[in-house]
Amino acid sequence: MKAMLVHRSKVQDEHGNTVEIKVWRVPATEHTPFGFKYSFVYIAGGERVIGYDNERGKGHHRHVGGEELPYAFKDIPTLTSDFLTEVAAFKRSTYG
């Protein structure tokens, strides 16, 4: 089974920044035991400021500023909520 795109959205927020979410269904393997590959990114001023992904070999992790931190994946709805919550916190701290 090839990776099958199950969700893709790309929108600009009220500040002109980009929120992009992509989720693929993939075979469950050692690297993707939940059967999903994903990439969630918030781009502000042309730079990735927040990102969540499960790149092969790195597992579930998030990017905040220039740091890469582990992420405890539970499921796609929780991942989406965590990402959007972090984006909202960034916008509050940056734009008031």
Over which residues does each language-model region extend?
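Short helix/strand-capping connector loops at secondary-structure junctions
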Residues: 58-71
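Short, compact, well-ordered microdomains
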Residues: 68-96
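The feature represents the first ordered module of a protein
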Residues: 1-61
